[in-house]
């Protein structure tokens, strides 16, 4: 975790506690190359250090809707994908990342890649490539998907023109983020999702999947990212803002004060307790 992760966690925790809800800690470890049990345990330790307690979930999957570790939930994702297959909107895609991100590939005005439909039926004819496993994509509609974000306000996204058909399962068998979080949020009864505003357009993709799977979407709240001194979003490479560094230089109360001031909850970055923020 880094400062940005902790900021999102705090804002989500405060929202849930103020509304009398239940805070779920889900371990999203879909990428085996970047996920280890010790990393998840460290996240739990960092949250406890700050005083952020959860009502369900965690590595040990306490609660009625477990397991709360995504790598243990493949059966749920497989069932959801089967439901989407039945709509006739999914198809195999043999495109590689390198092919899709070539300079000639279509991009949105902000530089975001738009899938051009290379393998979309009926273009798939003759497209299957021997010895190359396909990913699974879903056809998106050429219409506006609208929703009101609790922080960013009214939103309208045309998936076909701004994102394109997106992946549900990667060629290596890993489940895509969009399918996994929609399935999990629906089955776990999640009613509010709070996260960084870099994922704002993901909400439209997820709402589309909610529609197809017959679930009610949650409310979305996308908070501004914390940026470094160069105006770039934080990453694990920012070691000075890692939890290890922050715990060495701050008390829980002083770090809470810093984050609460960043959120506009208090006038200055002075130490504060969670009770005083509620």
Segments from the language model and where they lie:
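Non-catalytic terminal extensions that flank enzyme cores
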Residues: 18-23, 50, 57, 127-129, ...
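A short, terminal or domain-edge coil/loop segment
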Residues: 48, 79-89, 119, 143-156, ...
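Active-site cores that bind ATP or allylic diphosphates and position pyrophosphate for catalysis
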Residues: 98-235, 242-246
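Alpha-helix boundary recognition
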Residues: 82-86, 186, 247, 260
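N-terminal Rossmann-like or analogous alpha/beta NTP/dinucleotide-binding catalytic cores
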Residues: 1-108, 197-198, 202-215
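Alpha-helix initiation and N-capping motif
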Residues: 40, 74, 78, 97-100, ...
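Structural motif
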Residues: 1-3, 172, 249-254
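Polar, glycine-rich mid-to-C-terminal structural blocks
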Residues: 89, 135-137, 266-267
């Amino acid at each position: 975790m880094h400062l940005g992760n902790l900021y999102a966690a705090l804002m989500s925790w405060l929202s849930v506690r103020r509304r009398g809800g239940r805070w779920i800690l889900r371990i999203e470890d879909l990428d085996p190359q970047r996920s280890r049990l010790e990393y998840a345990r460290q996240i739990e330790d960092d949250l406890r250090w700050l005083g952020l307690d959860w009502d369900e979930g965690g590595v040990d999957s306490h609660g009625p809707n477990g397991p709360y570790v995504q790598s243990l939930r493949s059966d749920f994702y497989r069932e959801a994908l089967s439901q989407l297959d039945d709509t006739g909107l999914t198809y195999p895609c043999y495109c590689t990342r390198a092919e899709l991100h070539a300079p000639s590939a279509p991009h949105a005005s902000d530089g975001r890649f738009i899938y051009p439909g290379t393998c979309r039926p009926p273009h798939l004819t003759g497209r299957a490539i021997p010895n190359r496993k396909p990913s699974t994509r879903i056809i998106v509609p050429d219409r506006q998907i609208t929703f009101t974000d609790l922080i960013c306000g009214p939103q309208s996204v045309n998936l076909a023109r701004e994102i394109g058909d997106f992946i549900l399962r990667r060629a290596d068998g890993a489940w895509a983020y969009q399918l996994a979080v929609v399935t999990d949020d629906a089955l776990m009864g999640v009613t509010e999702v709070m996260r960084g505003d870099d994922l704002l357009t993901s909400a439209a993709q997820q709402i589309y999947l909610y529609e197809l799977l017959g679930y009610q979407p949650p409310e979305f709240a996308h908070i501004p990212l914390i940026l470094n001194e160069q105006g770039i979003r934080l990453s694990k490479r920012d070691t000075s803002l890692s939890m290890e560094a922050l715990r060495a230089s701050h008390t829980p109360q002083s770090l809470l004060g810093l984050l609460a001031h960043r959120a506009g909850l208090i006038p200055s970055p002075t130490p504060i307790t969670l009770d005083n923020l509620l």
